[in-house]
C-alpha cells in the first residue's frame, strides 16, 4: 500500500499534484483507509528524546514500534540526515506508508547562527529579515528538516521576560511586517521545493504578555487590548499564508491557550481565515493539568475539541482520544479535521510525492556553514547593531590606534551565539578579539584582558551558565566558573587600559541569561562587570562599551560615564567581524531600537504606544504630585523605541500632506524631505506614527503605521513618501469591530518615536 500511494502521487504534473482539488481527493481516499487510531497517530508529534540518538535505531525500541504502527505523525529535534532517512524509512514500512514531517527549532539559523531575532528586528530591513529565513531554510532542508518552529512573533513590553530575545520587540505593526517577511522567506512560493520549509508561527497567543515578565506566567489582557496591542503579528502571518501555528503555554481569560476555543477557532480560523494546523508547544497539553482544568484525558479532549490539531511531546492524544471518541466525549469530526489538516501539510510539502525529497546525499556538506552563509551572517549582523551613544564622535575608531579590548565577552566564541542557537559549531564563532585584530593587522594594536567574572557570586554564575547541562546531563563534570580572582582580572584590564589610546569593554549577558526560562528582576549589567567598568573609567581613558545582550538592560551608569555605547546584542557566528566593521567605520551603524530601554526595572512594563491617563504627565518631566508619574524617575525610557545613532546626521523637513482630508475610498500621501547633514553616507529609517485625537475608545499616544529605510549620501536630500488609507487608521473598538472612526488624526514623522514633527489629517 505504501508503494502504491507514493507511485500514484508521482504520476501527475506538478500543477496537478499541488492543486487543491487533487489534494482533497487524495486525502479523502487516504482517510477512508485509516483507522481511528491511525488518524489520531497523525496528531502526535514526538521528540528525539524518545530515541537513542546514534546511528543505529533498535527494532525493539517501543518508539520504533509505535512509528511502524502509525502512532506518530511527525518528529522533532533531529538534525542528522542519516537518522532522518532511517526514521522516514520506518514510517514508510507502515500499513499505509504515510510519511513523517520533521520539525526543529530554527530560530536564528541552524548550523550557521545569525543574530538573535530581536537584533535582526533592529535592522528595520524587511528584505534582510526575509533573506535570513530563506538562508536558514536552505540549511534546514539540507539535513532533512521540512518544518521550522519559527517565527516567534510574541509582542513583549517587559524586558524581564527572557524570550524577548526571540521576537521583534514591542510594536504590533512592525511585528506584523516582520512576521510576514519571515513567512515569505521560509515558505517561498512553493512549499514542495527542496529549499523551502513550512513555518510555524509561535506562540499563539499572547505569551509575551506574561505577568511581571515571569516566563510561563498568566496573561491578563482584555480582548480589545489583545487585538490592538498584541495579536496583529499572528494575524499578519496568517494572511501571509503561514502553514502552521504553535499554541502557547499561558492562559487567556482563564482558559489555557492550548484549549482556548476563542483563540484557536473563533479568531484564528473564523476571523483570519487560517487554513493550516495548530501544534501545541512542548508538553503544553500535559501542562494544562497543572493549570487545574482536568486530568490528562480531560485536557486532551478539551484541546482537540477547541481546535488544537497536534500534541507535541505529551502523548495525551494517543493515550486518550480513541476511547474519548468511542464514549462520545469527543466528536470524531474533530479528529478528522485535525488529521486532514496535517495530511494536507504533508501533501503541500511534497512528502507523498517523495518522502526523501530533502535528503540528497552530500547536500548537507555543501550547504551547511558555507561561504555564502557566513557572508550573509556578517552582513545581517552589520545592520543589527544600534549605536546608543557617541560622545564627541569617539567612534569610529582609527585602525592605527592602540586599543585595549577587555571584558569576559571579548574573547568568548560560544557566548556570541545567543539563546536558542541550534548550531553544533558554536566554538567557531568569530570573537570580538579576533574581529578587531584582523581589522587592524599591520597598523594599530589590540591588547586583551578578560577583565572580570560574569557575576561576583560564583554559585549564581554556575546556576546560570550550567543550568541546561545540569538538566540534560546531570552526571557531566563541570569546570569551576571562577579560576582567577576578580581583583586580579580587573587589575590586568586596568594595566592594559593605561597603555592604550582607547578602551573597548565587551560586557553584558551570557547566552543562558536570556531566552526561555531566563526571567530577570535585575536588568543591570552584572555586578562583576560593573566593577570592571568603573575601574576602567577611573583610568581616564576614552571608554567604549560594546553591549552583548538578548534584552534591554538598565544602563544608567553606562549612559552617564561611557563615551560610546554600541548595542551589539548576540550576533552569532560573525559577531566579531561585524562588530569590528562598525567600530572602525567600515560600516555605518543604522540599527534602531524596537523595544524601549528602561531607566529602572520599576518602570516595566514599558512601551512607547501607551495610552494617556486622566492625569497625564510629560514623559521627560520631573515629579509632580497628583499626576501619573514616579517620585524617583521620569516616565520616559532611557532609550526610546525607534532610537539609534549614526556616524552621520540627518535633518527632517516638516511633513506635508497631499490632502488634509481622507475619504473612505481614497488615499493621502505623506511626504518628508530628509537630508544627510554629515560627512558620511548613511542609512536612515524614517518612521510614521499616528494618533487618533478623539475616539470612542481610548487610544495610544502614538502608533507606528509606516517606515522606510533609505540610503542617503553625504550632503544629499531624499524625499520619502508614505501612502495612507483609512485601513491604516483602523482599530478594534469596544465591541471588537475593526473600524476607522471619522475625525482628526495627528500624523507624526521622524527618526524615532520621540523626535517627530506633526501634521493633522481629517478622516471623513
Where are these regions (language model features)?
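Short beta-strand elements
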Residues: 755-764
Amino acid at each position: 500500500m505504501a508503494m502504491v500511494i507514493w507511485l500514484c502521487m508521482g504520476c501527475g504534473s506538478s500543477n496537478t499534484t499541488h492543486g487543491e482539488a487533487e489534494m482533497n481527493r487524495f486525502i479523502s481516499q487516504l482517510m477512508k483507509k485509516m483507522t481511528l487510531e491511525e488518524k489520531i497517530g497523525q496528531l502526535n508529534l514526538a521528540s528525539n528524546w524518545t530515541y537513542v540518538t546514534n546511528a543505529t535505531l533498535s527494532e525493539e525500541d517501543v518508539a520504533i514500534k509505535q512509528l511502524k504502527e502509525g502512532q506518530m505523525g511527525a518528529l522533532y529535534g533531529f538534525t542528522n540526515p542519516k537518522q532522518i532517512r532511517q526514521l522516514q524509512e520506518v514510517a514508510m514500512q507502515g500499513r499505509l506508508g504515510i510519511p513523517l514531517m520533521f520539525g526543529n527549532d530554527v530560530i536564528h539559523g541552524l548550523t550557521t547562527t545569525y543574530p538573535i531575532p530581536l537584533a535582526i528586528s533592529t535592522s528595520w530591513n524587511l528584505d534582510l529579515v526575509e533573506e535570513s529565513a530563506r538562508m536558514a531554510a536552505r540549511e534546514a532542508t539540507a539535513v532533512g528538516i521540512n518544518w521550522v518552529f519559527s517565527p516567534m512573533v510574541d509582542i513583549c513590553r517587559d524586558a524581564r521576560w527572557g524570550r524577548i530575545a526571540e521576537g521583534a520587540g514591542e510594536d504590533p505593526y512592525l511585528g506584523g511586517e516582520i512576521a510576514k517577511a519571515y513567512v515569505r522567506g521560509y515558505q517561498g512560493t512553493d512549499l514542495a521545493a527542496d529549499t523551502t520549509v513550512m513555518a510555524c508561527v509561535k506562540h499563539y497567543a499572547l505569551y509575551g504578555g506574561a505577568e511581571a515578565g515571569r516566563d510561563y506566567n498568566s496573561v491578563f489582557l482584555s480582548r480589545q487590548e489583545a487585538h490592538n496591542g498584541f495579536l496583529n503579528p499572528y494575524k499578519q502571518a496568517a494572511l501571509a499564508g503561514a502553514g502552521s501555528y504553535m499554541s502557547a503555554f499561558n492562559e487567556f481569560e482563564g482558559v489555557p491557550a492550548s484549549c482556548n476555543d476563542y483563540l484557536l477557532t473563533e479568531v484564528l480560523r473564523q476571523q483570519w481565515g487560517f487554513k493550516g494546523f495548530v501544534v501545541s508547544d512542548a508538553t503544553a497539553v500535559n501542562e494544562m493539568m497543572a493549570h487545574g482544568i482536568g486530568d490528562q484525558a480531560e485536557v486532551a479532549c478539551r484541546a482537540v475539541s477547541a481546535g488544537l490539531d497536534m500534541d507535541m511531546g505529551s502523548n495525551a492524544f494517543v493515550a486518550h482520544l480513541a476511547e474519548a471518541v468511542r464514549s462520545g466525549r469527543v466528536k470524531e469530526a474533530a479528529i478528522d479535521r485535525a488529521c486532514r489538516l496535517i495530511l494536507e501539510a504533508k501533501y503541500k510539502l511534497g512528502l507523498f510525492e517523495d518522502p526523501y525529497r530533502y535528503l540528497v546525499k552530500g547536500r548537507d556538506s555543501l550547504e551547511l556553514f558555507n561561504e555564502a552563509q557566513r557572508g550573509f551572517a556578517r552582513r545581517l549582523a552589520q545592520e543589527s547593531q544600534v549605536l546608543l551613544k557617541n560622545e564627541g564622535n569617539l567612534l569610529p575608531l582609527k585602525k592605527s590606534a592602540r586599543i585595549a579590548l577587555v571584558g569576559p565577552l571579548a574573547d568568548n566564541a560560544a557566548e556570541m551565539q545567543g539563546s536558542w542557537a541550534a548550531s553544533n559549531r558554536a566554538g567557531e564563532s568569530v570573537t570580538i578579539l579576533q574581529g578587531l585584530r584582523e581589522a587592524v593587522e599591520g597598523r594599530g594594536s589590540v591588547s586583551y584582558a578578560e577583565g572580570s567574572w560574569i557575576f561576583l557570586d560564583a554559585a549564581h554564575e554556575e546556576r546560570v551558565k550550567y543550568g541546561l547541562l545540569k538538566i540534560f546531563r546531570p552526571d557531566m563534570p563541570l569546570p569551576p566558573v571562577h579560576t582567577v580572582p576578580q581583583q586580579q582580572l580587573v587589575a590586568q584590564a586596568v594595566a592594559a587600559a593605561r597603555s592604550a589610546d582607547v578602551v573597548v569593554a565587551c560586557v553584558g549577558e551570557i547566552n543562558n541569561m536570556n531566552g526561555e526560562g531566563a526571567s530577570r528582576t535585575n536588568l543591570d549589567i552584572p555586578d562583576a562587570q560593573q566593577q570592571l567598568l568603573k575601574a576602567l573609567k577611573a583610568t581616564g581613558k576614552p571608554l567604549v562599551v560594546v553591549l552583548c545582550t538578548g534584552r534591554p538592560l538598565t544602563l544608567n551608569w553606562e549612559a552617564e560615564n561611557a563615551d560610546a555605547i554600541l548595542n551589539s546584542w548576540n550576533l552569532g557566528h560573525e559577531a566579531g567581524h561585524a562588530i569590528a566593521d562598525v567600530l572602525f567605520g567600515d560600516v555605518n551603524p543604522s540599527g534602531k531600537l524596537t523595544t524601549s530601554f528602561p531607566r529602572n526595572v520599576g518602570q516595566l512594563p514599558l512601551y512607547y504606544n501607551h495610552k494617556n491617563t486622566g492625569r497625564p504627565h510629560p514623559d521627560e518631566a520631573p515629579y509632580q504630585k497628583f499626576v501619573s508619574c514616579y517620585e524617583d524617575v521620569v516616565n520616559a525610557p532611557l532609550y526610546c523605541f525607534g532610537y539609534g545613532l549614526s556616524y552621520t546626521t540627518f535633518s527632517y523637513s516638516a511633513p506635508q500632506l497631499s490632502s488634509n482630508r481622507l475619504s473612505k475610498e481614497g488615499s493621502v500621501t505623506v511626504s518628508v524631505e530628509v537630508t544627510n547633514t554629515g560627512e558620511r553616507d548613511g542609512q536612515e529609517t524614517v518612521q510614521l506614527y499616528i494618533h487618533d485625537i478623539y475616539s470612542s475608545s481610548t487610544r495610544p499616544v502614538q502608533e507606528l503605521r509606516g517606515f522606510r529605510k533609505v540610503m542617503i549620501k553625504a550632503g544629499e536630500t531624499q524625499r520619502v513618501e508614505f501612502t495612507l488609507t483609512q485601513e491604516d487608521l483602523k482599530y478594534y473598538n469596544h465591541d471588537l469591530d475593526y473600524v476607522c472612526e471619522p475625525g482628526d488624526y495627528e500624523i507624526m514623522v521622524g527618526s524615532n518615536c520621540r523626535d517627530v514633527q506633526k501634521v493633522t489629517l481629517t478622516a471623513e
